[in-house]
Design a protein with these regions (language model features):
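Alpha-helical secondary-structure segments
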Residues: 116-123, 155-157, 201-202, 231-236, ...
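Surface-exposed binding/hinge segments that line
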Residues: 119, 132-183, 209
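Aromatic-rich, solvent-exposed beta-strand/loop patch
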Residues: 103, 161-179, 194-247, 272-296, ...
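Detector for C-terminal structural segments
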Residues: 209, 213, 289, 294-297, ...
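Structural transition elements
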Residues: 203, 308, 341-376, 395-397
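N-terminal lobe/hinge region of extracytoplasmic solute-binding protein
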Residues: 37-87, 125, 132, 198
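Aromatic- and charge-enriched surface segment that lines or borders ligand/interaction sites
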Residues: 82-133, 159, 248-253, 311-312
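A structural "hinge/loop" feature
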Residues: 40-59, 79-80, 106-110, 168-178, ...
Length: 539
């Protein structure tokens, strides 16, 4: 049954468009509808619940934050025209646009309800409020002062005060958790607010058929322009909820989806050749877009497990295992050249602070690995204990390849396949001595990866329970450093420290992969894998 949340006369042609397949349908020719699929569904349109990528993309269509990222991951104004930072780095003052209004909704007592600084205060306090249980509360927790951290100086001036300097805060304010909502809507809809978005974004919700599709239409009063032209260019968006990724791709090849993002590993060879390019039957029919993705796949070692039964308690053994991994081979044979071998640290290609000349990771070198095991007196053990590597089914083949390489030098790696939710639980509880994991940047800053090794952080993010006083000192120093060049130098020094201690084994850096219909223009991929449709056009 179709659940209509909002209704205007525009809804009927939009719904007809989704149903009609006739190429002669005049409405279909007229309306510019971008169609994509969310195989995992959308659970909420509330910004403070924007944890899953599907929710993040949806919130990005419906709401705005004070700042935003362009496709190069540079911070740009959004609801805030500009901002200033006090000399001590504690006070951020944002000057808001005065031409932004929320979409029309019955929750408001006035028409054309304008954005005010008090909306920002409410939204940020709500994000921190335990009553709302936002998974994004960490953004402000422990960073802003306890009493009145957010202040509306007047309707267009908002201030945020920190406990101590924290330069990454601007990048964090680009996260969808921090997008602005009106208090009237939250109060009016209560627990149903997740299904009644009232935002300032380029699109607005018209209908949501749970388990089937969601329909968005353009916000006619959206404030952003491009070269004097009002945004967005699209008339609407249709988001379908097909659970099977292979079926999703078939819908794309049938012309029923405007684009698809990524492919299941089992299906890659049916679409891409060994060089990561479209197979002959797809070349020319579709656009293939790639760019670095701020995601690192790695093997983690539990540094707290120092029992003699765990060979990984010895740093030399951990380093030896790092030299056993043929990262180039993994990318070539298991990934069809999608992604990049992690020959540096955890900070991936795509971040400005990534520098392969200053941070050298591990190459494939079995001879060096053997020498390290000799130094560790590993071969003198009568019955060396095996290393148990926990992973899920999706990474089984890569894990077995690592085990096979390790076996060549007498390191015994036993691969255990367990359910993803159990693996996460064991990682958090410190029950997995060796585990396959991944880390995605929450915001485009090197600190988003280095926080994995700060001893004051529990798991997550510090799943390896790494503790190093020298690293901690540099980490804390970097949080106070406003000069980017100096901050990056601190990042590089930190990377060298943990690489030497080897609490992790970086395997590869991920890559954004998008398959796009030829009539779509203006869809820029980005390293955060954020879907921004306000500048997209359909030819």
């Amino acid at each position: 049954m179709l659940k209509i949340l909002f209704y205007t006369g525009f809804l009927i042609p939009l719904l007809c468009l989704s149903a009609c397949q006739s190429p002669n349908n005049s409405t279909k020719d007229k309306l510019k509808i971008f169609k994509y699929n969310e195989h995992s569904g959308i659970t909420s349109t509330d910004p403070i619940l924007a944890k899953a990528q599907s929710n993040i993309w949806c919130v990005n269509h419906l709401y705005n934050g004070l700042v935003q990222l362009n496709h190069r991951l540079e911070i740009e104004p959004s609801l805030a025209k500009y901002w200033t930072i006090s000399s001590d780095g504690l006070l951020y003052t944002f000057y808001l646009r005065n031409d932004v209004q929320f979409i029309e909704d019955k929750c408001f007592k006035v028409k054309n309800r304008k954005l005010k600084a008090s909306d920002v205060v409410y939204s940020f306090n709500r994000l921190l409020d335990p009553a709302f249980a936002s998974p994004g509360a960490w953004i402000f927790r422990g960073k802003v002062i306890d009493k009145n951290p957010f202040v509306a100086v007047n309707d267009t001036v908002f201030q945020l005060r920190l406990i101590s300097p924290f330069p990454p805060i601007l990048s964090m304010l680009s996260m969808q958790y921090t997008y602005i909502v009106p208090q009237e809507a939250v109060s009016y809809y209560g627990r149903q607010f997740s299904y009644h978005p009232v935002g300032t974004g380029p699109f607005k919700l018209k209908a949501w058929e749970e388990g089937s599709a969601m329909y968005l239409v353009k916000n006619e009063h959206y404030f952003e322009k491009e070269n004097g032209k009002a945004l967005p260019y699209l008339d609407g968006i249709k988001i379908s909820f097909i659970a099977n990724k292979k079926s999703e791709f078939m819908e794309f090849t049938a012309g029923k989806l405007s684009f698809v993002s990524d492919l299941e590993t089992s299906y890659i060879d049916q679409v891409l050749d060994d060089n990561g390019q479209l197979l002959a039957q797809y070349k020319g029919k579709y656009q293939l877009m790639k760019c670095p993705y701020l995601k690192t796949e790695y093997i983690g070692f539990n540094m707290k497990d120092t029992s003699s039964a765990n060979p990984l308690h010895d740093k030399l053994v951990r380093k030896a295992l790092n030299y056993c991994v043929d990262r180039e081979k993994i990318i070539t044979y298991f990934r069809n050249l999608i992604g990049y071998p992690a020959t540096g640290g955890m900070i991936p290609i795509g971040l400005p602070c990534f520098d392969s000349t200053k941070v050298k990771g591990y190459s494939y070198d079995l001879e060096k690995a053997k020498q390290l095991l000799i130094q560790a007196h590993y071969y003198e053990l009568q019955r060396p204990h095996s290393i148990v590597l926990y992973t899920n089914e999706n990474y089984k083949e890569i894990a077995l390849t690592i085990a096979k390489e390790a076996d060549k030098i007498g390191l015994y790696v036993q691969v255990e396949i367990i359910e993803p939710n159990i693996l996460r639980e064991w990682m958090t509880q410190g029950k997995a001595p060796c585990f396959r994991a991944s880390w995605i940047a929450d915001y485009p800053e090197g600190e988003s990866f280095l926080c994995l090794f700060y001893s004051k952080n529990a798991a997550p993010p510090n799943y390896t329970q790494f503790h190093n006083a020298a690293f901690d000192k540099l980490y804390e120093q970097s949080l106070l450093e406003n000069n980017l060049t100096k901050r990056y130098e601190l990042y590089h020094e930190m990377e060298r420290i943990y690489l030497d201690e080897s609490p992790v084994m970086p395997i590869y850096y991920e890559e954004v992969l998008r398959f796009v219909q030829n009539n779509i223009i203006g869809l820029e991929p980005n390293a955060m894998n954020l879907l921004d449709l306000k500048r997209v056009q359909i030819k």
